[in-house]
Structure formats: C-alpha cells, structure tokens
Amino acid sequence: MSNLKQLRTRIKSVKSTQKITKAMQLVSASKMAKIKSQIANSNFYIEAVSKMMSAILSIDMYELSIEEQKFFNTVPNKANLLIVMTSQRGLCGTFNYSIIKQVKNDIKELENKGEQIKLIIIGKKGYEALKRQYVNYIDSYFELPKIHDENLMLQVKQKIMSAVENLEVSNCVIYFNKFKNAMTQIMTRQQILPVAKYQDDSMIDNPIVNLVGFGYKERGVKPINNRRATSDIVGESKSIDYNYEYEGESLISNLINLYVNSQINYALLQSRASEEGARMTAMENATNNANDLISKLVLKLNRSRQAIITTELIEIIAGSEVV
C-alpha cells in the first residue's frame, strides 16, 4: 500500500508541475506575439537608418568632421568591444549556451592575437557564465528588465558612444539570437562600428535614401544643392520631399546616434523574441514530457493495484479451499 501512496503522490506532483509549465508556455507565447509585432513595426525605421548610414560610406571622408570619422574608421591597437545579449532568467533551452559558446571562442581567438577586449553584458545568465573567467574584461553589466525598456538602450548607447569618442575601442560587435520562429533562433554576431556596408537580408522592401540629397557629394559626383532625396521602392524610382531640422554637420552626428540606438534596439527585440520562443518551446516539451510521465505512472499505479487485488483474491480462494 505504501507503494501506491508514493505513486499517487508522484502523479499529483507531476500534474502540478505540468500546470506550471503549461502556464509558462502560454505566457511566453503571448509575450512572443507582442514582441514580433514590435519587430514588424520597427523594421522599416531600423532598415532605413542602416541604409542611410551605409550611404555615408560613399561620401568623401573630408566631408565629415574628425569626431564623425571615428565611427567609420578602425582605430588600431585599441580594445575590441563585445556586447553580449543573454536572458535574465533560465528555462529557455539552449538559448544562452549558443551565445556564450561563441563569445568564449571569439575571446580565445582575440587573446591568441594579443588584442585587448572589453565586454558589455546584458542579462544575468551571460554575466554569471562569463564573470569568473573574464572578470577583468567586463566593462559594464546591465540587468534585462521584464519589459522592453528604452532606458537600457540609452545606457548601452552612451557606453558605446563614449568608448568610440574617447578612442578606447577599435570596433564594436554585438552578439544576440536572431528570431526565425518559435523553434529556431539564429546565433548572430553583428558589427555595429565601424559602420559597414548595409547588407539587405530581404526583411522588407523599404526606401533606400540617398544622402546626396542632404548636400553631401558622392565620390566623383558634383555636389547637389537641392532639397530632394531619391527612393527606390520595389524597382520604382520616386522623389520624396524631406523637411530638415539640422544643418549638414549636425545631421550626420544625429544620424550616428540614431544608428547606434536602432542597432541596439533591433538586437534587443530579436533577443527577446528568441528568448520567449525558446522558452515556449522548452515549456511545451516539458508539458508533453510531463503528460507522458503521468501516463506511465498511472499505468504503473493501475498494475500495482491490480496485482494487490489479484493477490487478495488468491488468498481468499486459498482460504475457502482450506475450509
């Protein structure tokens, strides 16, 4: 009988755990849907800013101020700034493992080359995994808030801008998981600075803004003084009027700020969506495993009960035969 009691207790415990994992699965599914909506709404803005920054590469560097040129050129013999985005909580499968593994491999490679390293870590899990081995490299650590917070973006951006302006780093790379679907997250290593040529990953078809319209001249092209910029939308060439609030010099500076902010925002949204997708999948698997375990325990319970009943019947029959 004690065996039956243990089985019933275990079944009750597994059912309780199953309710928790199911609830977590539903919560993660809801959060993932909201973040996917945020990503869709911000894609146009992020891609447009990236393309404008890429277009600056076609401008003669003497058109830019010395401060602005720092964001487009590599500074030799300075630290490599690595921004690592992980989760604040666990129970999300291999979400953090793939990021941490790649960061450790890259750090080892940089150490072998004798290069300097600085780490900005976002998320408790990444900090816990890296602090013991690379505590001397950690420049900053930020906890990931429960909801998407612009203050976090601004703090990280200020760290990056300050490091570049003070010539403390030669480049800046961000590590995050890119969301593909609930079951698939792609470990991504993306260079933020120096600004690289924009690579279209066919997210959406958006206008490509030509900075010639801002009064800057392309290499080998005479300056254009009009106040119109061109845009290519699905193969069509259209002219778009813009209202400018900044002069040419301050425009680039503000665009650099927008660019860095948009890249951090993009990585944070992708990382959050990937985290919730990974957690939803992990909790779904846990719920299914709990269901399978309950079925096995119930079967074992029924067999044990049947064995006890059979034994009692045999004893009764044996007793009646003696009488």
From Swiss-Prot:
GO CC term (a single one): plasma membrane
GO MF, one annotated term: proton-transporting ATP synthase activity, rotational mechanism
One Pfam family here: ATP-synt
Domain of life: Bacteria
Keyword field: ATP synthesis, Cell inner membrane, Cell membrane, CF(1), Hydrogen ion transport, Ion transport, Membrane, Transport
SUPFAM superfamilies: ATP synthase (F1-ATPase), gamma subunit
Region listing for Insert, in residue ranges: 206-240
Subcellular location per the Swiss-Prot or TrEMBL entry: Cell inner membrane
GO biological process: proton motive force-driven plasma membrane ATP synthesis
Protein name, entry field: ATP synthase gamma chain
Gene that produces this protein: atpG
